[in-house]
């Protein structure tokens, strides 16, 4: 399940956002906090909030940023909450 995976090192693109200027930002995730991704693109870095955005990872996995709004080390512990929000068991 991509929602509990490690995102650092993956290619990411913002495909939907409450801020229209964020749509289309893409690059490699170089750092992650509870609320943000640091995306390396070209020669610069951009910090993008997770909340209110939908991302694609590696060009195939669509992820709602609101559901991964946890510290990376806490996502596995919060697996049941994430699954419930996704409509699973």
Swiss-Prot record:
Annotated compartments: Cytoplasm
GO biological process: tRNA 5'-leader removal
EC number: 3.1.26.5
Domain of life: Archaea
Keywords, alphabetical: Cytoplasm, Endonuclease, Hydrolase, Nuclease, tRNA processing
GO cellular component: cytoplasm; ribonuclease P complex
InterPro entries: RNase_P/MRP_Rpp29_sf (IPR036980), RNP1 (IPR023538), Rof/RNase_P-like (IPR023534), Rpp29/RNP1 (IPR002730)
Presence of the UniProt keyword Hydrolase in the record: yes
Catalytic reactions on record: Endonucleolytic cleavage of RNA, removing 5'-extranucleotides from tRNA precursor
One Pfam assignment: RNase_P-MRP_p29
Molecular function GO labels: ribonuclease P activity; RNA binding
Function: Part of ribonuclease P, a protein complex that generates mature tRNA molecules by cleaving their 5'-ends.
Oligomer status and interactors: Consists of a catalytic RNA component and at least 4-5 protein subunits.
Protein family: Belongs to the eukaryotic/archaeal RNase P protein component 1 family.
Protein name: Ribonuclease P protein component 1
Provenance organism: Thermoplasma volcanium (strain ATCC 51530 / DSM 4299 / JCM 9571 / NBRC 15438 / GSS1)
